[in-house]
Each structure stands twice: as structure tokens, then as C-alpha cells.
């Protein structure tokens, strides 16, 4: 099984093309975990860096026409060097423009995984789910949404919420770990996309296990952070979450995981 130990040994370079709000939090989270982040946003630089990368994150949170072109260029280069790319289609259900960009990236470029909340992933497959911007209300059929997207796109899917669902090759698992404090801190979902990009390329052909490990490490770190002094407060939780990502071990994952 893909492990946190393996990630720390390989220390993959992860290119993060992400939104302006979360760059610092994302970089610090990846460093704490054991990966090596780079926030490059220029095609010539990406050509150089992606030769050595273990993963690429495309997060469309800060969307512009120029950024759309950047996403396209990055995905072309990633495919050239066989770098697994993860798409976070932020708020793609909020309007036609975001949906158009997400559809373009999914249908015309090679992706290793798509990560989004229930509202975002449901919008990609035409399922109605109550959502508002980047947020999504509690959803009971999250596993069905994940499976529908996996079947439609033939791409591994991660749907996040109170319960998380992972669908790969028609198989679905649900993750029941996590902290209620995570939605209280901006950027936790965006960092998750980068964490997935860190794990997804560690072992070829083991996408389900890689995604499961990424989700468990992330969610159990959230549980650890919330239990610490003042972890119920957003400011403290944010700091303690980074600390927990630094300290969490494979033994913690094995002991506390709740997977169905």
C-alpha cells in the first residue's frame, strides 16, 4: 500500500498552479508532509520543472482567461513528461464560465484524478446538488456521485464532504475520518488537492490505494489538530493542522482509519 513513509523517501516535486488565496498555506502543508512544492506559473519554467516533477495540481479557484491558457499549457507539458495531473474544479457548478473551463480540461487533457466537493463533481455529471460557490451542503449519495463521475470520465474521482468518497475503475470506498474544523479554514480543500497530487504518482497502477492513503493522512491530521489545545478555534487549528501533517505517521493512519 502506498505509504506516508514512501512519500517522505521520494519527496516528490509537486507543481501547484493554484489560486492566489491559498498558495502559502498549500506550500507549507506540502513541506510539512514531506513533499517539495513549486508554485510556477510560466510555461517556459514549467517546461523545465515538470521534467523532474512527481505531480501537478491545477486548481481553477482564481480563474481568468490567461490562467485558463496556463492550465492548458501545463497539462500539455505534464503529459509530455508523464507527470500525473490532478484537477480541482473549484466552484465549477457556480456558473457557465467555470463549468466550460472544467469541461475543457477534463475532455481534452490527460488527468490522473479529479478532486472536488459534492456540488462541484455533481455539476460535472449533471446531478442536482444544493451548493453555493465553493461550498456544498450535506449530501447522502456522495458515493453515487463519485461513481457516476468515474464512469463518465474514466478518471479516478475524489468527492469530499462530511464523508469522502473515492471512485476508481468502478470501485468506491468511503472515508469517515476528518474534522469539522476543516471547512472553517480557507484553503484546506485546496491543500488537499496538492496532497493528492503528491501521492498519486508514487506507485503506478495503485491509484485507489494512493488516493485512500492521501485522504486518510489528511483527514486524520485534521482530527489530531482539533484535539490539541484550542484546536476548536480556526486560527489555532490552522497552525496545528500544519504541525499534524508534519508529525503524522503510517502507524497513526493504521490505528485511526475509518474506511468502508
Swiss-Prot record:
Coiled coil: none annotated. ATP binds at residues 115, 160. It catalyses: 5-(2-hydroxyethyl)-4-methylthiazole + ATP = 4-methyl-5-(2-phosphooxyethyl)-thiazole + ADP + H(+). GO terms for molecular function: ATP binding; hydroxyethylthiazole kinase activity; magnesium ion binding. GO terms for biological process: thiamine biosynthetic process; thiamine diphosphate biosynthetic process. Substrate binds at residues 39, 187. This is Hydroxyethylthiazole kinase 1.
Amino acid at each position: 500500500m502506498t505509504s506516508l513513509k514512501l512519500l517522505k523517501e521520494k519527496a516528490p516535486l509537486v507543481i501547484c498552479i493554484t489560486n492566489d488565496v491559498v498558495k502559502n498555506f498549500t506550500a507549507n502543508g506540502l513541506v510539512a508532509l514531506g513533499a517539495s512544492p513549486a508554485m510556477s506559473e510560466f510555461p517556459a519554467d514549467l517546461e523545465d520543472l515538470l521534467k523532474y516533477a512527481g505531480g501537478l495540481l491545477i486548481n481553477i479557484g482564481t480563474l481568468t482567461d490567461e490562467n485558463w491558457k496556463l492550465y492548458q499549457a501545463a497539462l500539455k507539458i505534464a503529459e509530455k513528461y508523464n507527470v500525473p495531473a490532478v484537477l480541482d474544479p473549484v466552484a465549477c457548478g457556480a456558473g457557465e464560465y467555470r463549468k466550460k473551463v472544467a469541461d475543457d480540461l477534463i475532455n481534452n487533457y490527460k488527468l490522473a484524478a479529479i478532486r472536488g466537493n459534492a456540488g462541484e463533481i455533481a455539476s460535472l455529471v449533471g446531478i442536482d446538488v444544493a451548493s453555493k460557490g465553493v461550498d456544498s451542503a450535506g449530501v447522502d449519495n456522495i458515493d453515487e456521485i463519485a461513481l457516476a463521475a468515474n464512469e463518465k470520465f474514466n478518471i479516478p474521482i475524489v468527492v469530499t464532504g462530511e464523508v469522502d468518497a473515492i471512485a476508481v475503475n468502478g470501485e468506491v470506498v468511503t472515508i469517515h475520518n476528518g474534522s469539522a474544523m476543516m471547512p472553517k479554514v480557507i484553503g484546506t480543500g485546496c491543500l488537499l488537492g496538492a496532497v493528492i497530487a503528491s501521492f498519486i504518482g508514487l506507485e503506478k497502477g495503485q491509484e485507489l490505494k494512493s488516493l485512500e492513503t492521501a485522504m486518510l493522512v489528511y483527514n486524520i491530521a485534521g482530527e489530531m489538530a482539533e484535539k490539541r489545545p484550542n484546536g476548536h478555534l480556526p486560527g489555532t487549528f490552522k497552525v496545528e493542522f500544519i504541525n499534524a501533517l508534519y508529525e503524522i505517521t503510517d502507524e497513526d493512519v493504521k490505528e485511526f482509519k475509518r474506511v468502508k
